[in-house]
């Protein structure tokens, strides 16, 4: 089986490094599916799930957005925040979502709403991943 090397790197650590059969990432234009020998590509990623598929199964990683660099034999994903799906905290994500929604409701014109919207999108993406994982376990 042909493989491609994938590295998922956050601002603080290397979260994943290994050979995979394919990787899926949430690009700004839609989900990317990357297989071995893929054409070179550079794209912006939005908050969401990165899935790496190996002969041992699928591993999911939450990213807060970032950049993906694809070469025929190597994929590198850079993100400010990356968390293994099993380590996502639903209560923290719910709190962050509530804080962001309240901040948007109480925002004045002089405040930077775009930063608040980014925080809201990140918390929603985390909650969607948690729900997806929960539904697979049932």
From Swiss-Prot:
Listed Pfam families: ATP-synt_DE, ATP-synt_DE_N
Q: Which GO terms describe its molecular function?
A: ATP binding; proton-transporting ATP synthase activity, rotational mechanism
Show the InterPro entries listed in the entry: ATP_F1_dsu/esu_C_sf, ATP_synth_F1_dsu/esu, ATP_synth_F1_dsu/esu_N, ATP_synth_F1_esu_C, ATPsynth_dsu/esu_N
* Its membrane topology: Peripheral membrane protein
Give coiled-coil spans as residue ranges: none
Q: Which UniProt keywords apply?
A: ATP synthesis, Cell inner membrane, Cell membrane, CF(1), Hydrogen ion transport, Ion transport, Membrane, Transport
Q: What compartments host this protein? A: Cell inner membrane
Would the keyword Chaperone turn up in this protein's UniProt record?
no
CC terms in the record's Gene Ontology section: plasma membrane; proton-transporting ATP synthase complex
**Cysteines joined through disulfide linkages:** none
* Classification via PANTHER family: ATP SYNTHASE DELTA/EPSILON CHAIN, ATP SYNTHASE EPSILON CHAIN, CHLOROPLASTIC
NCBIfam families named in the record: ATP_synt_epsi (TIGR01216), PRK00571.1-4 (NF001847)
Q: What is the protein's known function? A: Produces ATP from ADP in the presence of a proton gradient across the membrane.
For this chain, the family text in UniProt reads: Belongs to the ATPase epsilon chain family.
Q: Which HAMAP family match?
A: ATP_synth_epsil_bac
Q: How does it assemble?
A: F-type ATPases have 2 components, CF(1) - the catalytic core - and CF(0) - the membrane proton channel. CF(1) has five subunits: alpha(3), beta(3), gamma(1), delta(1), epsilon(1). CF(0) has three main subunits: a, b and c.
User: Could you identify this protein by its name?
Assistant: ATP synthase epsilon chain
Source organism per UniProt: Ruthia magnifica subsp. Calyptogena magnifica
- What taxonomic ancestry is recorded? Bacteria, Pseudomonadati, Pseudomonadota, Gammaproteobacteria, Candidatus Pseudothioglobaceae
Q: By which gene is this protein encoded?
A: atpC
